[in-house]
């Protein structure tokens, strides 16, 4: 099973990172993509991908950190993207919910990362929150120059999902869909996502599925819970879990591993 979104550099894993990876393996999660959210964290994510077999990483600047983008950022990302473990540019995009960086800073950093991904022929690992229309307006000119794109941790509306899917994008589904308070709209739209455009992720240590029983004492999410997300998504889509696992694994390999060196 392939978890396409694990925040491996989180300090929440500092005391048991090796054990967390071992638990994932024991649960059948044998492939993982580690998310880079800043230049420094992207470098660390790459180092961890080098350390753990069957793992890769992204390199990018999250919209929260867009204010750090400067004249040297693209060159540093380009150098990092030359590492065999790095298989996508991101996490990049727009987040107008918190605006930790200004909208102008976010749009500039996003556009420059799209430019870099196109130049390097790498897929993009995308973030969008409360910015759908502007997100698509900036993304659209680049889509035909990119080998692929996934909107990670999709939590939008059915209309937003359809607009992304019409552009050939993949949608990443997390344990958010297991939340009976705020995940019902996402759960209802699962059947409209073509099987060849669906990816699964935990976004660990965040977004622990609320319907886990018993819940882990730490309340921390881990990639070992990806099989639970898979089972629930398959049920709500009316599909066999083993079939959906094979389909989503194939999607992840097609998007991220076309040119990757064996991990």
From Swiss-Prot:
**Which residues take part in binding a divalent metal cation?**
91, 127, 152
Question: What is its subcellular localisation?
Answer: Cytoplasm
Q: What is its EC number?
A: 3.1.11.-, 3.1.13.-
GO cellular-component term (any): cytoplasm
**CDD domains assigned:** TatD_DNAse
Gene3D superfamilies in UniProt:
Metal-dependent hydrolases
Q: Which domain of life is it from?
A: Bacteria
> Which coarse location class applies to the principal site listed for this UniProt protein?
cytoplasm
One term of GO molecular function: magnesium ion binding
Pfam families membership: TatD_DNase (PF01026)
Record's keyword terms, sorted: Cytoplasm, Exonuclease, Hydrolase, Magnesium, Metal-binding, Nuclease
Name the needed cofactors. Answer: Mg(2+)
Q: Quaternary structure per UniProt?
A: Monomer.
Q: Which family is annotated?
A: Belongs to the metallo-dependent hydrolases superfamily. TatD-type hydrolase family. TatD subfamily.
The free-text function statement in the UniProt record for this protein reads: 3'-5' exonuclease that prefers single-stranded DNA and RNA. May play a role in the H(2)O(2)-induced DNA damage repair.
Q: What name goes with this protein?
A: 3'-5' ssDNA/RNA exonuclease TatD
Q: What gene name is given for the protein in this entry?
A: tatD
């Amino acid at each position: 099973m392939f978890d396409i979104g694990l925040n491996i550099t989180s300090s929440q894993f500092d005391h048991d990172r090796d054990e967390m990876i071992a638990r994932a393996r024991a649960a059948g999660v044998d492939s993982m993509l580690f998310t880079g959210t800043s230049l420094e964290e992207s470098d660390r994510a790459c180092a961890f991908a080098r350390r753990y077999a069957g793992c890769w990483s992204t390199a990018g600047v999250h919209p929260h950190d867009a204010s750090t983008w400067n004249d040297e950022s693209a060159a540093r990302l380009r150098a990092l993207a030359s590492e065999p473990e790095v298989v996508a540019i991101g996490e990049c995009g727009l987040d107008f919910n918190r605006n930790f960086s200004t909208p102008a800073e976010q749009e500039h950093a996003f556009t420059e990362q799209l430019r870099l991904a196109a130049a390097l022929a790498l897929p993009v690992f995308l973030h969008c929150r409360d910015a759908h229309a502007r997100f698509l307006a900036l993304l659209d000119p680049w889509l035909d120059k990119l080998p692929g794109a996934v909107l990670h941790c999709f939590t939008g509306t059915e209309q937003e999902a359809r607009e992304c899917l019409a552009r050939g994008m993949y949608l990443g589904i997390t344990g958010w869909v297991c939340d009976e308070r705020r995940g019902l709209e996402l759960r209802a739209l699962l059947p409209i996502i073509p099987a060849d455009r669906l990816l699964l992720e935990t976004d660990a240590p965040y977004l622990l599925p609320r319907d886990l029983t018993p819940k882990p004492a730490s309340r921390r999410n881990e990639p070992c819970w990806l099989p639970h997300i898979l089972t629930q998504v398959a049920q709500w889509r009316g599909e066999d879990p083993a079939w959906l696992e094979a389909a989503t694994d194939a999607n992840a390999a097609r998007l991220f591993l076309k040119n990757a060196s064996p991990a």
